[in-house]
């Protein structure tokens, strides 16, 4: 039985992801780690309408009865938890960011908040990009150095100590992508409006 507070955390983040257009009806997944256990969205569940039975518990290392119901991208979440100190993972399909990933090798925010929160988001390419070991290894390796990365044409993976934190990076990425789109549509020369401190540029 899933703890009520844990359920509410999953429900609220899932709903926020859907409301913010970070996923389609059945897309994306989220998870948290507790020691050697993982709680993850059920395969096929709708993030915008999560129920307690849509949260599946399974092992970080070993399969058990829950693995058959877990998200198809459980392998990626496991790899991320093994490679990083993350306690939460948010995987989304943000539309403008997906479009940018098809033409860029990294997404570099041009707005102040995006630059401060993310600086840049690398775009990772793999030959087989749906729940494969190749995909899991590539994403996990990139997240050793970044808190949010993008799988080309697929979606974002963000880590945090909480789901709120991982959601923040995801939402900031899509907002930054939207601002890039607006600026490109203006078709005018960008005006440099800020200078970053030395500590920021070395980060």
Segments from the language model and where they lie:
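Glycine-rich flexible loops
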Residues: 1-203
